[in-house]
Amino acid sequence: MELSVYISNERIEIVAGTGSKSKAKIKKVYSLAVPEGTIMNGIITGEQRLQETLEQIWNRYSLPKKGICLVIDSGKIMTKMLEVPYMKDKELISCINKEFADGEKTDLVTDYFPFPKNSPYEMNHIFCAAVEKSVIESYLSLFADLKLKVKRISIGLGCLLRAVTATGMFAYETCVFMLVQGSTTISVLFENGNYIYSRRNRMLSDQGSAEWIEELGQIADGIRQFYRQRHSSYTIDSIYLAGIAGGSDDVVKEFDTHMQEYGIRAKAPGMIKGISFVKTAVSDHGEINAEPASYIYGIGNLLL
C-alpha cells in the first residue's frame, strides 16, 4: 500500500491505497487541518509547526512511514504542453529542460506526462512541469526529519491529468473541471476529452456563499470566452465541480442555476471508472462524506 500525500494552504489530504495503470483501490482517506501560515501557495513557510502537525497525524493514525508519494501544487510551478516526434527518454528530458531554460531560474526540477496516442503516426503530446529545486528539497527535508521515506514526488496538475486520461473520466466531453482547494480553485478545460488549458484563482468569498458562487461564475465565463476565441466546432456544455467541504450536492445545484444563462450545466463528477473508493474520509471532527473527484490528486498519484 502507498500513501499519496498532498498539503494545501489549509489541509493535508492523505489517500491510502494501491494502483495500477488505470485502476486504483482506495482503502482510507484523510482530510485534516494544518496550522494557518505553514504552507503558502505550495511553499513551506512554517516548517516547525508543520513538522509538529505531521508528527501528530502519523502517530495518531498509525500511518505507514514508507511508500509515501508526495503531491505538490503551487502557482510557482511552470507548465507547458509540447508536441514532439518520437524521442528516447534522454532526448525528451533534454528537450523539456531547454523549454524551461531561464536565466533567472537555472536550478529546476522537471517532470512530464505523455498523453496516449490514437495512432502510432501521431506526434507525441507531452504535459511538462518545472519547479525550483529548492521547493522539492524543502519537502524532502521536512519528511526526512520525521523519518518518513518519500518514494516519489508528483505535480498536482499532472496527477489530475493522469487520473482523467487513465480512467476516461471526461472521454469525448468538452467541459471544465473545477477543483476547489480551500481558498483556491483550479479550473481545467477539456475539448473532446483532451486537455486544453488550466488556470488557478484565489477566491475572495466564503465557500458556498452567494458571492462565492458569483466568483465561480465569473471564472467559468472567462474560460468560456477564452474557448470561443479558438473557433472550435465543440462547445462547453458542462462544468464539473469537486472539492466542496462536506459534499457538493447543494452547492452544485446553486451553481447550476447560476450557469443556466450561459447554456452550461453544473454537475458533480460522481464515481470514477476503475476507482474503488471509500464513502467517508477521516477529518478533525469525525467522518465526512468523501467524493472521489475531490481527491483526484491523490488518486492520480497512485496510477502508474
What are these regions (language model features)?
Residues 1-99, 136-140, 235:
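Non-catalytic, solvent-exposed interaction/assembly segments
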Residues 2-28, 70, 121-223:
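Small-residue (GG/TT-enriched) beta-loop-alpha framework at ligand/catalytic clefts
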Residues 34-38, 205, 272-280:
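Surface-exposed loop and turn segments in beta-propeller and other repeat-based domains
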Residues 67, 71-166, 268-282:
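Active-site neighborhood for divalent-cation/phosphate handling
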Residues 215-232, 251:
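Phosphate/ATP-binding catalytic cores across multiple sugar-kinase/actin-like superfamilies
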Residues 236-264:
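Glycine-rich phosphate-binding loops at beta-strand->alpha-helix junctions
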Residues 255-294:
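Conserved phosphate-binding/catalytic loops in two-lobed NTP-binding clefts
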